[in-house]
């Protein structure tokens, strides 16, 4: 799902299903990891500990705050070591087009290869970021679902404001379709037809489509901190 909101307008591409993001209560409890060293004990939240292994999790709808966090982590890992792979795990129904494009452009600009791994669901902008990983290093667990579609839009206000938003959503639709065609190798005409409505795929179907390069299991799961061999 892609969502972009201004004061009076929104461009949506979020998956319209029974999914929720728990921001309060037990759903937001972050486990802590305690490490022993010569200096004593040191506690990390689990995501910071995984970041040390060059693993980033995108497990929520995508908004500006999420994008800022993901981009900051990508830039940090790029500065730390430009030759080691970064692993980006994705379980997301999508979200803001503009926030998602901030993550996308960062993935394309940083020096390390970005290994993208779908677990659960990669829908809309989540699927777009999945296929934006380094060619040959885009993966999915076998029972994951991947969905692509066109952005959804709504506008209110004066006629000229609605016209401006209509032009913007058509521009975004064309841009995303062209980038999907570039990353998947599919003809633009097929991308346009398939994204006209929600288009769901299994992991194997996404591989055949060109969204990912391999379906992984325990035997070939990427190892933290190690570079992944490109699948051709």
UniProtKB/Swiss-Prot annotation:
Enzyme Commission code(s) on record: 3.4.21.92
Catalysed reaction, written as an equation: Hydrolysis of proteins to small peptides in the presence of ATP and magnesium. alpha-casein is the usual test substrate. In the absence of ATP, only oligopeptides shorter than five residues are hydrolyzed (such as succinyl-Leu-Tyr-|-NHMec, and Leu-Tyr-Leu-|-Tyr-Trp, in which cleavage of the -Tyr-|-Leu- and -Tyr-|-Trp bonds also occurs)
GO molecular function terms listed in the Swiss-Prot or TrEMBL record: ATP-dependent peptidase activity; ATPase binding; serine-type endopeptidase activity
Enzyme's top EC category: hydrolase
Signal peptide feature range: none
Subcellular location: Cytoplasm
GO annotation, biological process: protein quality control for misfolded or incompletely synthesized proteins
Main location class: cytoplasm
Domain of life: Bacteria
Repeat is among the record's keywords: no
GO CC term (a single one): endopeptidase Clp complex
Keywords on record: Cytoplasm, Hydrolase, Protease, Serine protease
Active site: 124 (nucleophile), 149
InterPro entries, sorted: ClpP, ClpP/crotonase-like_dom_sf, ClpP/TepA, ClpP_His_AS, ClpP_Ser_AS
HAMAP family given in the database record: ClpP
Subunit and interaction comment: Fourteen ClpP subunits assemble into 2 heptameric rings which stack back to back to give a disk-like structure with a central cavity, resembling the structure of eukaryotic proteasomes.
Protein family according to the UniProt entry: Belongs to the peptidase S14 family.
Primary role: Cleaves peptides in various proteins in a process that requires ATP hydrolysis. Has a chymotrypsin-like activity. Plays a major role in the degradation of misfolded proteins.
NCBIfam families: clpP (TIGR00493), PRK00277.1 (NF001368), PRK12553.1 (NF009205)
Protein name (database record): ATP-dependent Clp protease proteolytic subunit 2
Native species: Nostoc sp. (strain PCC 7120 / SAG 25.82 / UTEX 2576)
Taxon lineage: Bacteria, Bacillati, Cyanobacteriota, Cyanophyceae, Nostocales
Encoding gene per record: clpP2
């Amino acid at each position: 799902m892609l969502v972009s909101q201004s004061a009076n307008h929104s461009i949506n591409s979020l998956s319209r299903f029974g999914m929720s993001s728990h921001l309060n209560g037990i759903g937001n409890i972050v486990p802590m990891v305690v490490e022993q060293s010569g200096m004593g004990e040191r506690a990390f939240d689990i995501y910071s500990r995984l970041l040390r292994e060059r693993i980033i999790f995108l497990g929520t709808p995508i908004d500006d705050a999420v994008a800022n966090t993901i981009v900051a982590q990508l830039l940090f890992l790029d500065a730390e070591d430009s030759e080691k792979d970064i692993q980006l795990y994705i379980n997301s129904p999508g979200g803001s087009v503009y926030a998602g494009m901030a993550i996308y452009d960062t993935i394309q600009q940083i020096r390390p290869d970005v290994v993208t791994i779908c677990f659960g669901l990669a829908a809309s902008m989540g699927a777009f970021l999945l296929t934006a990983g380094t060619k040959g290093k885009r993966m999915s667990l076998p029972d994951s679902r991947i969905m692509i579609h066109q952005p959804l839009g709504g506008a209110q206000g004066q006629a000229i404001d609605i016209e401006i938003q209509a032009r913007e959503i058509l521009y975004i639709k064309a841009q995303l379709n062209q980038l999907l065609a570039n990353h998947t190798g599919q003809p633009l005409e097929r991308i346009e037809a398939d994204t006209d409505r929600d288009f769901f795929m299994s992991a194997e179907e996404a591989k055949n489509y060109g969204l990912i390069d391999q379906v992984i299991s325990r035997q070939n799961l990427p190892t933290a901190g190690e570079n992944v061999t490109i699948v051709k």
